Structures are given as structure tokens and as C-alpha cells.
A protein has these predicted regions:
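Generic structural signal for well-ordered alpha-helices
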Residues: 31-38, 64-71, 96-97, 128, ...
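Short beta-strand segments
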Residues: 45-50, 83, 177-179, 203-205, ...
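Conserved, mostly hydrophobic/aromatic
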Residues: 38, 67, 71, 99, ...
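Active-site gating/metal-coordination segments in enzymes
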Residues: 44-45, 53-150, 196, 200
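Active-site environment of divalent metal-dependent phosphoester hydrolases
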Residues: 2-6, 53-56, 86-90, 113-116, ...
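Non-membrane alpha-helical structural segments and their capping/turn regions in soluble enzymes
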Residues: 25-28, 61-64, 89, 93, ...
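Mid-to-C-terminal alpha-helical segments outside catalytic/metal-binding sites
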Residues: 2-45, 97, 223-225, 235-271
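Catalytic pocket-lining loop regions of alpha/beta-barrel enzymes
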Residues: 105-109, 120-228
Length: 271
């Protein structure tokens, strides 16, 4: 992500307790360095999450151009996620179209950092409706942050998973991904939505792998709609390798592990 855009308070939280911060900066500055890390870890492809939240985090719409350029280093391996925040661009729907043209594969909404409820289009926000409409037309999944955020100024009420219920209903051809599975307060809501809606998925990034079955004891039931992720280098996520190893040690079927680690992402983001 473009760390140079981050507000000092947000950047301080990203740095806190992270001994490898210099390495993180190096990976962000040079995609070849990051690809070398993926090779070392045995990771075939990675989704790089970016979004627009100028007031709380500092990310402006220019983050889309930054990540599109970054991922051009290896578009077969680096999956670009960009963002739209109505009011920061003249036409939110047109911005989604532009994102698709420059190689961005998915849209990320962060309700608690954007102070924007996922279903706000039902209350007159036509620009948000345009985001969903154009993403659906362009075949771009929309990832929506669910659950809490500890960043200064985050408005967590907007990130309740059930607010995404309307989105799944009103845009039935849109792939919706609930980021973080509602962690840590709303995981039952996320599980319910993934089971209810054909077009609803979730990722498990930002959740300690050893706690996954405590939070989602019936995770194997939805294994075909769960995406593995780490949320690295976010707060509380020290490394990628340990996350993978702990996930692989879970007492679930190998078939379920493969779906979560590989098959589901390969299906949603074909090369």
C-alpha cells in the first residue's frame, strides 16, 4: 500500500511493534522485492488491498493508480484491489470503469474508515449504487471490511456484516467478499450471510489462525466460499509464514484447506 499517503496517526499504528518495518517499506517500494518474498514463502499469488479513505487513513483516489502500476510488474501473480469513495471523484461509477481499464481486479470498501455504510444506497446515495452496478457489470468482486478497526477515528458501527445483506440481494451477480469475517464481534453474522447468499464470500485475514475454529466451528460447511488471507503487514499480523503454518495445522480436511488456500481465489480471480 502507498505508505507515503498515510496520516501520521495511522502510520504510527502500522509501525508499532513491527521490527520488520524497513523490510515492509522496501517491499512497498519495489514489486520485485515483494515477489522475491513470495517466492521464498512458496506463495504463488497475492491480493494487494488498497482503498480510499482520505480523512481517517490518508489514502486518496491516487492509490488506484499506484497499485495498478505496482501490479503491472507481475499481473499474473499480483491481484490489484482498488477503492472508491463517493465524493472524492466526480463520478464513482466511472472511476470503477477506469479501475477495470488500468488492471485493477476488485473494489475494496472500508465502511469504518470511509464512514459509509455498505447499504447507504438504499437511503439515497446513488454514487454508491453506481459503484456496485459498475463492479457487477465489469465482473469485479467487491470486498467490504467487516468487524472492528483500531485505527484512530474509525467508525465501527458502519462495518457490521448484516449491512451487506442488502447488497447481496440487490446485486445478485456481484461477488461480495466480507473481509475478516466480521472479526471479532460479528462472526456469527458473517457466517450466516455466507451460507445464505450464493454470491457472498468471506476472507479470514486478520484472524489468528489458531482461533479460526473457535470463531467458526462449522467453517468446513462454507469452505468453498472462504478465502485465506493474512492482513499482513497490518497491526497484529507479524508474518506470513507462521500464519500459513498455523492454518495448515488446523484439524479440518485437506480438501477444505485447499479450497480456502487456493481453489476459491483461483476461481474468483482467474488468470
Amino acid at each position: 500500500m502507498p505508505y507515503h499517503m498515510m496520516k501520521p496517526s495511522a502510520l504510527e499504528l502500522m509501525k508499532r511493534g513491527r521490527k520488520d518495518y524497513a523490510d515492509v517499506e522496501r517491499y512497498c517500494a519495489n514489486p520485485k522485492e515483494f515477489l522475491g518474498l513470495l517466492d521464498h514463502l512458496g506463495v504463488e499469488r497475492a491480493g494487494l488491498i488498497n482503498y480510499v479513505a482520505p480523512k481517517i487513513i490518508g489514502f486518496t483516489p491516487e492509490a488506484n493508480d499506484w497499485i495498478a502500476k505496482y501490479c503491472k510488474a507481475a499481473p499474473d501473480r499480483l491481484i490489484a484491489f482498488g477503492g472508491v469513495l463517493p465524493g472524492t471523484v466526480p463520478d464513482a461509477g466511472a472511476e470503477v470503469d477506469r479501475m477495470a481499464r488500468i488492471g485493477i481486479r476488485a473494489v475494496k470498501l472500508h465502511p469504518s474508515h470511509q464512514v459509509l455504510s455498505p447499504n447507504e444506497y438504499m437511503h439515497g446515495n446513488r454514487e454508491l449504487a453506481a459503484v456496485y452496478e459498475r463492479a457487477q457489470t465489469n465482473g469485479m468482486p467487491v470486498m467490504i471490511h467487516t468487524g472492528t478497526s483500531i485505527f484512530p477515528g474509525a467508525r465501527n458501527l458502519h462495518a457490521q456484516p448484516l449491512l451487506c445483506d442488502d447488497v447481496a440481494i440487490d446485486y445478485p451477480e456481484l461477488v461480495v467478499i466480507l473481509a475478516h469475517g466480521g472479526r471479532p464481534l460479528c462472526m456469527e453474522e458473517a457466517f450466516f450471510l455466507v451460507r445464505r447468499h450464493k454470491n457472498m464470500h468471506m476472507d479470514i485475514s486478520g484472524i489468528p489462525p489458531q482461533k479460526l475454529l473457535e470463531y467458526f466451528p462449522r467453517m468446513e460447511e462454507i469452505a468453498g466460499k472462504v478465502l485465506w488471507g493474512t492482513d499482513w503487514p497490518g497491526p497484529g499480523v507479524p508474518e506470513i509464514k507462521g500464519n500459513i503454518e498455523k492454518f495448515l495445522s488446523l484439524p479440518i480436511r485437506d480438501e477444505a484447506k485447499r479450497k480456502i488456500l487456493y481453489d476459491n481465489a483461483a476461481r474468483l480471480f482467474p488468470r
